[in-house]
Amino acid sequence: MKLGELKIETLMLIFPSISIDVDTESGDALNEALSNLKADPNYCDYLSAMTGAINRCFTNLESKGVLPLRYTTFSSADFALEADRLSLDISKIKGKIERVDFRNLWERKENCDFTLEGNSLIVEDLGEGVYTVVYEAEIPRIKNITGANYIIDLPDKITSLMPYFIKSEVIMTDDSDEASSARSLYEAGIAEIINSSNRYGYQGEVESVFRV
């Protein structure tokens, strides 16, 4: 979903009587629609408040354990040998490491023991092979200057719930009951994702953090 789409969908939740029809595939059309809305005194304050609310939503999603898991692989030769263990600088991986797997021609070992020491990943030396680091990537935060066509790289089932969280944040001082109702819808949707998802079942996105 594009950032401009998210803001417009949230605005239509806040103001159910308005209908904003815009060709989201057209970058110019989305920019124009959002610019016109920002110029309207009825909507500008709500749109301005959405940047912080969206970033708070990202933080909330990271705490829920619902984000798609990504992975990247390393050869054992990429690690530094320290006594009977291997050490690797993983400072370029931005997110929470969920597990480490190992494989070679003879064996496959899942959920290897690992520890984190600063920016270093420490694993047992299992010989020559490939280590797969599975992690939940941090969501990049947006700024007030982030454009309407910025892509929020999250599954549709997650982005479809975000307007409820954002609405609950930006109308809290205006209508606390309506804000609570919107947050409840968001939390219910997130709970459904948690109950129905096998997180280890959708690791299809590969982020090339390091060259193997």
Predicted regions mapped to residue ranges:
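Glycine-enriched, solvent-exposed interface loops adjoining structured elements
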Residues: M1-V212
